[in-house]
Amino acid sequence: QLTGALVTHYHPDHCGGSFGQNTVEGVSRLLEHVSLPVYAHELEADGVRRVTGISEQGIKKVTSGDKLMVGDIDIEFLHTPGHTPGSQCFRVKNTLVSGDTLFIDGCGRVDLPGSDTEDMFRSLQRLASLPDDTLLLPGHNYSAVPHATLGETKRTNTYLKIKDPETWKMM
């Protein structure tokens, strides 16, 4: 049984909505068929509402460290700003759903309205501190493989190799 929808950030390719001449079905279409909460970071809730058209009451605002139990599955929300102010990842046991924060070979864009390079650096450093055997499931597959362990990603992803904020700013 479906009990909720998790949103990594407000961009239409992740929650549905319109951008330019394109429309992506997403949570608003889902809510036409079933009533359930849409979990979005508190800083992202207005953006989700704006692009999807769902009501403020339909959004359950969460913050970093909040947990959601679905049956015996514990989902932890991790605030990872940078791509957007309220970007978040979901951690389920030893799996990380990273949205547009972290890809196998890259990270989310930081040249878009609302993005922030320094926040992205801190978010990536935070994710890099998770155990190496964490399975990474990114929001897009721009790599030869759709998933990898965080340890493998740390060895190959240039953005995770940078440990100095000044070097990061030059990327």
Predicted regions and their residues:
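Short loop/turn motifs at secondary-structure junctions
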Residues: Q1-L2, D132
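Active-site HxH/HxHxD metal-binding segment of metal-dependent hydrolases
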Residues: L2-I73, R155-Y159
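Metallo-beta-lactamase
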Residues: R50, I54, D74-H79, T84-E166, ...
